[in-house]
Amino acid sequence: EEAAKKAEIRQTNKKAYVNESPFYSVLETQKNNLVTTRANTSYVYTPNLTKVSVEVRTYNDIPDDVKTFESYFEGLFPNCRKISGASSIYNCHSYAWHLSAWNNPYWMPDPRDYWGDGSYVKYNPGSYFQASTRAVFKIGSSNNADNWHSVLIRKAYTGTTKYVVAESKWGPYGLYEHYLLDNPWAVNSSWVTH
């Protein structure tokens, strides 16, 4: 019931929802460049050799309050397991699509070339989820990658989405192992698998 109430607030009044939800408050702060990191532009390539722009961040700029929020999020998602701590060096898109390692050196603003060039094909998993596939959560109808979250499915699973094991990097926060739909972006979003 509380989740439905928050979803309704988010749909009708984004500002009220941001004020109601610490997670989205921090994301809004990050989007408004109040959490900043110096970066240089570089490129990585999809399996079909399309050039993708990435940022090589020269400083891991994690304010103390971000670490406090990370602890708060872990309380909201108790079934998640932290793999590594907060880092503004890499993000969920880079982790899921380019290099699945905690020491990944790239922040990828937009992953859509990975499926746009045919390197990964959208599929409907039905009741079978393949290991090493990816899911992209899109909040609302936005085509802006700032509102997307990429997840790497780690273990093959037959059944409902409830127990599909995935990993993802949560913005500038930690890298987590979690069930596919047990992440902050899964609420009130649509998702596709590749």
Regions found by a protein language model. Give the residues of each.
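...with weaker cross-activation on analogous glycine-rich loops/strands in unrelated enzymes
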Residues: 108-174
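Mature extracellular/secreted ectodomains of secretory-pathway proteins
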Residues: 1-18
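A structural signal for short, hydrophobic beta-strand segments that form beta-sheets
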Residues: 86, 90, 153-156, 187-188
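A recurrent domain-boundary module in secreted/ectodomain proteins
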Residues: 13, 19-31, 194
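N-terminal capping segments
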Residues: 24-113
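Positively charged, low-complexity intrinsically disordered regions
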Residues: 11-12, 39, 135
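Glycine- and charge-enriched low-complexity intrinsically disordered segments
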Residues: 171-194
